[in-house]
Amino acid sequence: MMSNIHTNISEWMKMSEETPVIISSRIRLARNLENHVHPLMFPSEQEGYRVINEVQDALSNLTLNRLDTMDQQSKMKLVAKHLVSPELVKQPASAVMLNDDESVSVMINEEDHIRIQALGTDLSLKDLYQRASKIDDELDKALDISYDEHLGYLTTCPTNIGTGMRASVMLHLPGLSIMKRMNRIAQTINRFGFTIRGIYGEGSQVYGHIYQVSNQLTLGKTEEDIIDNLTEVVNQIINEEKQIRERLDKHNSVETLDRVYRSLGVLQNSRIISMEEASYRLSEVKLGIDLNYILLENFKFNELMVAIQSPFLIDDDDNRTVNEKRADLLREHIK
């Protein structure tokens, strides 16, 4: 019986068609409470639980999930779905509040007391900001948020002071990556206050030619400025990726076709495969589909990139290794 990978991803991601380059977009707002020390300085776990209770009371329309009541596998599933950060999982008194389709998550007691996230599948940062801002307004009505008239919102990390906003877009960039253009792009956008990271943010590894592009600074900038500037940067990167793909198709079609079919062969025939190799093979097959080299019915890149992660493969009643189960899953779904 074929495994149902559709159950692994959030409802918001199921609702939209996959695009050649944009995987997802996110707006994150960092907020702190005036009457509590910052989470990294909590004198006891009880202080963290008090913050959780206050935020829960302020956001009664969201569902609370306390991480200290979850097993490690359940926590890592939330990380894989980008609903919480790896850092939140490490905190002893932490929680996340979610809406029904998981397009909104509110992390409690990570680096800051509150981190509001709004998630979407296209370049709709302004809409996402409006959604996050509504949550922020609810918190502001019920809680005493740390704010300075001259500096703006006060955050644990100095780079977040100001709007407290991080806007980011996840991009699939196999062309630029294969042609080794990513370092140059990263250096260029860094000069304008933007950065490129792995799929889980700062310090994380790049999998499957997927990169996260985000703003670095918020002080002295409005939310609209950050969104407009990031949108412009992302559109420039997308255009470069499209140009590279056209060049690969026109001038390196045999090599590109070979790369695509080699990856397809590996995915369809492997009995053992690592997360890293699987992600890059999937990326190259998606490139082949986007270039109309191959046609695979029901190929869901975003869903597979979630499903191949270890938290969704671990099963105490199954004696296969994770790498074996990953290979079996990919053979089932790529035909």
UniProtKB/Swiss-Prot annotation:
Keywords: ATP-binding, Kinase, Nucleotide-binding, Transferase. ATP binds at residues 24-28, 82, 115, 166-170, 197-202. One of its GO terms (biological process) is phosphocreatine biosynthetic process. It catalyses: L-arginyl-[protein] + ATP = N(omega)-phospho-L-arginyl-[protein] + ADP + H(+). GO terms for molecular function: ATP binding; creatine kinase activity; protein kinase activity. The keyword NADP does not apply. Coiled coil: none annotated. Residues 21-244 form the Phosphagen kinase C-terminal domain. Its EC number is 2.7.14.1. PROSITE patterns: PHOSPHAGEN_KINASE (PS00112), PHOSPHAGEN_KINASE_C (PS51510). It comes from the Bacteria. InterPro entries: Arg_Kinase, ATP-guanido_PTrfase, ATP-guanido_PTrfase_AS, ATP-guanido_PTrfase_cat, Gln_synth/guanido_kin_cat_dom. GO terms for cellular component: extracellular space. Catalyzes the specific phosphorylation of arginine residues in proteins. Belongs to the ATP:guanido phosphotransferase family. This is Protein-arginine kinase. It comes from Staphylococcus epidermidis (strain ATCC 35984 / DSM 28319 / BCRC 17069 / CCUG 31568 / BM 3577 / RP62A).
